[in-house]
Swiss-Prot record:
Residues 1-32 form a transit peptide. An all-trans-polyprenyl diphosphate binds at R190, K267, T268, Q305, K322. This is Solanesyl diphosphate synthase 3, chloroplastic/mitochondrial. May be involved in the supply of solanesyl diphosphate for ubiquinone-9 (UQ-9) biosynthesis in mitochondria. Synthesizes C25 to C45 medium / long-chain products depending on the type of substrate available. Can use geranyl diphosphate, farnesyl diphosphate or geranylgeranyl diphosphate as substrates, but not dimethylallyl diphosphate. Disruption phenotype: Embryo lethal. CDD domains: Trans_IPPS_HT. Isopentenyl diphosphate binds at K125, R128, H174, R191. Homodimer. Mg(2+) 1 binds at D181, D185. Binds 2 Mg(2+) ions per subunit. It is found in: Plastid, Chloroplast; Mitochondrion.
Length: 422
């Protein structure tokens, strides 16, 4: 597989170079930096929650001239056309059935509230579950030494069920966060249908979210792996932190690209990255492989949200399932506007007045149209997609065709994230 091998040769440089993960100082003179979450030291925890700080260019000594051209190669050099979702379709069906079983409750209204959102908000493509199921295969499951004496087939099957459990837990956490977000944002719709807080009220929406989190906690405990519990607990904490950052930001923070990227990691990428790492941990993989799984999820999540922020300006209400321009109308400043402000500083004053005078939205759009804001945000998303693909290319080589196919599918997802229109 030409593309994956070429990515592996390039990306192995940043895996061997510990400073890429372990220090922001070594890259301080370049427009790329990595900062750790609070509570983790750079030297002893190189993979627990790094946040891209200002990833405008990857032309650092670590990467040489490796820029977003790699992404373009990914779509042309993959050996065969793959549909990542069809590869795991059967398991996605099992996962959906299991989720329906898990949200049953003694109080019928609580169960129906959770079921309402799963039917309308989760079923579709099941993006996060697809990533995690593909990652489980891509990591080429190796049986932990403690279980060597048992039947390999049985252990592998049980391990797959446990890994699928990570996908189920991740979906419940994700949906719970959406239920709570809709209350905080006073949202009317979600993916084109009435949001639960509108249909059943804020109280029931909050309780349904809490209920899903409690079921996720129970499922996590059943895995009996404290490292996995810590990873998913961190992701939940980050969801809360990111939302808090959005609603409590100062004026300067609101217009800071660093702040925006950190908030984006917390709100979107942390759950994907920590879940990917949890899948690796359950397989008994090495720390280096766990880092690669984490980095894939982190960068794919960042790319996904950057494109989402672009689509808020370029998409339509029908295709996005939400009102177009919803971010700027609610005072949420995203990458396209931040980049546009670098060219037109006067845009900041216009955006400041949007909530007082909605007519300023049109003025802001005029500035955005004259700027390279959309283009630069897309380039930044492409760079993160490239890093995600590079992480997969750095996984240990294998002759297993299923593993190769899953890795190609994960790379294909980086392409789909960038080219999606909804």
């Amino acid at each position: 597989m030409l593309f994956t091998r070429s990515v592996a040769r390039i990306s192995s440089k940043f895996l061997r170079n510990r400073s890429f993960y372990g220090s922001s100082q070594s890259l301080a003179s370049h427009r790329f930096a990595i900062i750790p979450d609070q509570g983790h030291s750079c030297s002893d925890s190189p993979h627990k929650g790094y946040v891209c700080r200002t990833t405008y260019s990857l032309k650092s000594p670590v990467f040489g001239g490796f820029s977003h051209q790699l992404y373009h190669q990914s779509s042309s050099l993959v050996e065969e056309e793959l549909d990542p979702f069809s590869l795991v379709a059967d398991e996605l069906s099992l996962l959906s059935n299991k989720l329906r079983e898990m949200v049953l409750a003694e109080v019928p209204k609580l169960a129906s509230a959770a079921e309402y959102f799963f039917k309308r908000g989760v079923q579709g493509k099941q993006f996060r579950s697809t990533i995690l199921l593909l990652m489980a295969t891509a990591l080429n499951v190796r049986v932990p030494e403690a279980l060597i004496g048992e039947s390999t087939d049985i252990v592998t099957s049980e391990l797959r069920v446990r890994q699928r459990g990570i996908a189920e837990i991740t979906e419940m956490i994700h949906v719970a966060s959406l239920l709570h977000d809709d209350v905080l944002d006073d949202a009317d719709t979600r993916r084109g249908v009435g949001s639960l807080n509108v249909v059943m009220g804020n109280k029931m929406s909050v309780l349904a979210g809490d209920f899903l989190l409690s079921r996720a906690c129970g499922a996590l405990a059943a895995l009996k792996n404290t490292e996995v519990v810590a990873l998913l607990a961190t992701a939940v904490e980050h969801l809360v932190t990111g939302e808090t950052m959005e609603i409590t930001s100062s004026t300067e923070q609101r217009y800071s690209m660093d702040y925006y990227m950190q908030k984006t990691y917390y709100k979107t990428a942390s759950l994907i990255s920590n879940s990917c790492k949890a899948v690796a941990v359950l397989t008994g993989q090495t720390a280096e492989v766990a880092v690669l799984a984490f980095e894939y999820g982190r960068n794919l999540g960042l790319a996904f949200q950057l494109i989402d922020d672009i689509l808020d300006f370029t998409g339509t209400s029908a295709s996005l399932g939400k009102g177009s321009l919803s971010d700027i109308r609610h005072g949420v400043i995203t990458a396209p506007i931040l980049f546009a402000m670098e060219e037109f500083p006067q845009l900041r004053e216009v955006v400041d007045q949007v909530e007082k005078d909605p007519r300023n939205v049109d003025i802001a759009l005029e500035y955005l149209g004259k700027s390279k804001g959309i283009q630069r945000a897309r380039e930044l998303a492409m760079e993160h997609a490239n890093l995600a693909a590079a992480a997969i290319g750095s996984l240990p080589e294998t002759d297993n065709e299923d593993v190769k196919r899953s890795r190609r599918a994960l790379i294909d997802l980086t392409h789909r994230v960038i080219t999606r229109n909804k």
